[in-house]
Amino acid sequence: SQCQGKRSWPQLVGSTGAAAKAVIERENPRVRAVIVRVGSPVTADFRCDRVRVWVTERGIVARPPAIG
């Protein structure tokens, strides 16, 4: 793939969305982490500069964040 830098953060499952966003953007400055509530509609496009951080209604990371 053409995406550069760290690509996934499985260790962040169970963290708060805000903490996960900070870690992701620190570990790969090329990406912007976007917090999204599980079940929200999102676009299907793939982007190397985006990491979706899927959180529960309580703001806890529910899936391993990854570039996409």
Curated annotation (Swiss-Prot):
Gene3D superfamilies, per database record: Trypsin Inhibitor V, subunit A
Single GO molecular-function term?
serine-type endopeptidase inhibitor activity
Recorded hits in Pfam families, A to Z, give: potato_inhibit (PF00280)
Residues with site note (Reactive bond): 44-45
Instruction: List all disulphide bridges recorded for this chain.
Output: 3-48
A biological process (GO) of this protein is: response to wounding
Q: Which InterPro entries match?
A: Prot_inh_pot1, Prot_inh_pot1_sf
Ordered alphabetically, the record's keywords are: Acetylation, Disulfide bond, Protease inhibitor, Serine protease inhibitor
State the signal peptide span: none
Disulfide bond recorded as keyword: yes
What's its job? Competitively inhibits Glu S.griseus protease by forming probably a 1:1 complex. BGIA has no inhibitory activity against 2 other acidic amino acid-specific endopeptidases (S.aureus protease V8 and B.subtilis proteinase), chymotrypsin, trypsin, pancreatic elastase, and papain, although subtilisin Carlsberg was strongly inhibited.
Protein name from the UniProt record: Glu S.griseus protease inhibitor
Species per Swiss-Prot/TrEMBL record? Momordica charantia (Bitter gourd)
Kindly list the organism's lineage: Eukaryota, Viridiplantae, Streptophyta, Embryophyta, Tracheophyta
